[in-house]
Amino acid sequence: PYRWLEDFTGEEVGAWVELQNDLSQKYLTKNQYRKKIKENLESIWVSNSKSIPQIRGGHIFYFFNEGSWQQSKFMTLACEGCNPEMLIDPNTFSEDGTVSLSSVSISPNGKFIAYSVSDGGSDWKTWKILKVETKETLDDQLKWTKFSSASWEPDNSGFYYLKYPEPKKEALSEINKNPQLYFHRVGSSQKMDTLIYERPDKPNWSWSIHISEDSLYQILSIGEGTDDRNRLYIKFKGEDTFLPIVDNLVATYRFL
């Protein structure tokens, strides 16, 4: 009976959402403690916060919020005691604040930042690359990614990411299957990306990749659906095939 609600952009769904909002606001505005709760929350929010720092290439990277920003800014320090510099301000992504910074991945030498952007809370992400020295966002744009990290090659040439086939119908409601693992080289078009791994025979599998510091191993962590357990596959440098280390969903495994 609720199938019609899957049409996110439909007028009927929009009208229903508006009615639901009106109903909830009528109830919430009657709460005699509403103003006091709001004031108390705002007093808590207005405080500086910093994320755990990461060090790459001698630079320190971290998220910072002075308390009133809707989204934290991504900052860098060239050295301890140096003045902080802002690299990414997601509050400028859109006027209504619906475009957010989802995740960041710093290249090993600290010269590039791969970061993903989400629009309207969607699981779909677009990956972009920032050059730290100039604070310039490059032309690289990687679309149709979802539930993906960016795993850098130790030589800083590029990173691996998970991509789904472009939806044929409605991007927000279509079921996504058959993800593919690609390698993107910094400064190139997504059309030039190299396909690293896919399993059309296992459409519900998804994976993340870890590259050893010496570049001798590529380790795939393979999940299935929402199961926390995973498989582990490995590929040695110079080889073409990933070999299973753990090929059954028995436990959760991590490569150290």
Question: Which positions does each model-derived feature cover?
Answer:
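Beta-propeller folds
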Residues: P1-L256
